[in-house]
Amino acid sequence: MVYNEIGKTGMKVANLAFGASSLGGVFHDLREEEGIRAVHTAVDNGINFIDVSPYYGHLKAEMVLGKALKEIARDRYYLSTKVGRYGKDGVNTWDYSAQRATDSVYESMQRLNVDFIDLINVHDIEFADLQQVVDETLPALVALKKKGVVGHVGITDLQPENLKWVIEHSPEGTVESVLCFCHYSLNDDMLVDYLDFFEAHGVGVINASPLSMGLLSQRGTPPWHPAPDPLKEACKRAADFCTEKGYPIEKLAIQFATSLNPRIATTLFSSTNSDNVLKNIRFVDEEMDRQLVEEVQRIIGDQMRVRWKNS
C-alpha cells in the first residue's frame, strides 16, 4: 500500500481504508468477535483509516468498533464518523440541526471509546436541506473543531454535485474532505470530473464502495440494489468475463479504485472477515491488469456512469 494525505489535513492514510458499515450487520448477520478480529487484522497490516457512522446498523457498528478500538493504541489509526443520518428500531431518521450534530459527536465518542474524532462528516447530505448544512450543521462541527473535540470536518454523499454545491456556498476551508461512493469504480468514474474543483479548494477526496455496493461481484448483485436492470446485467457480464479469465472482478475493482488516481487519497472497503481483509490488501499490492480494465469497461459499454438514487 501507499500512503497519501487527505487534502491538507496532515492525515497520511493508506490507499485502502476500513469501512465499518459491515460491523453493524448491514450486509449479513454479524458475529461480533469476527468483526473485532477484522478491525485488528486491518490495523496490524497497515490500514490506518477507519470510517463508521451511527447510522450503520443503527448504532451497532459504532459499538462493535468501539470494542475493537479498546485494544488498539490511539496513535495507530485515524477515526472518522458522521452526523445527520440515524436510525432506531429499523426506522431511518435524519436530523441535520446544530444541536443534534453536536450531541451526536459526543454520543459517538462514548460508543467508540475515544475522546477525539479525527474526521467528522455530515452524512449523506442529499437527504438534507443543503442550505441548512451550510448554515447550521457545518458551523456546529467547526465549533467542535475549535474546542479540540474533532480534528477535521468533511461531508459525504452519493451525488458529487451536492458536495460541490456545499463547498461553493461555505466559507473557504470549512469543508476539508469529501467522501463519495460508487463514483470511482470500474463501472463509474464520474468522480474524476470533480477532482480539479476539490483540489482547487484544498479538499481531500475519499472514495468508497469500490465494488459499487455489490454490482462488481462474482456472487451477483444483491436483490436490494437500486441500480437499473441494464446496469446490473452489464456488470454481471463483466464479472463472468473476469471469472473466465481467472481474475476475480473484485480484485480488479479494488485495484482500479486504489491505483489509478493519486488525488483520491484512499478507498474504503468493508468486511467482517479477516481473510477478506488480508486478500484485499494483497490485491492492492499486486500490479493491475490494465488491458482487462479496458475489456471490462467495453463490456459495460453504454451503462458506464449510469446512476441511481440513494436510499
Predicted regions and their residues:
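Conserved, mostly hydrophobic/aromatic
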Residues: I6, F18, G35, I50, ...
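Acidic (Asp/Glu)-rich catalytic clusters
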Residues: K8, D44, A68-D75, M109-N113, ...
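Short, acidic/polar
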Residues: D29-A42, S97-L112, Q159-I167
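Active-site groove signature of glycoside hydrolases
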Residues: M109-A128
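Beta/alpha (TIM)-barrel catalytic core signal, keyed to glycine-rich beta->alpha loops juxtaposed to Asp/Glu
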Residues: I125-N310
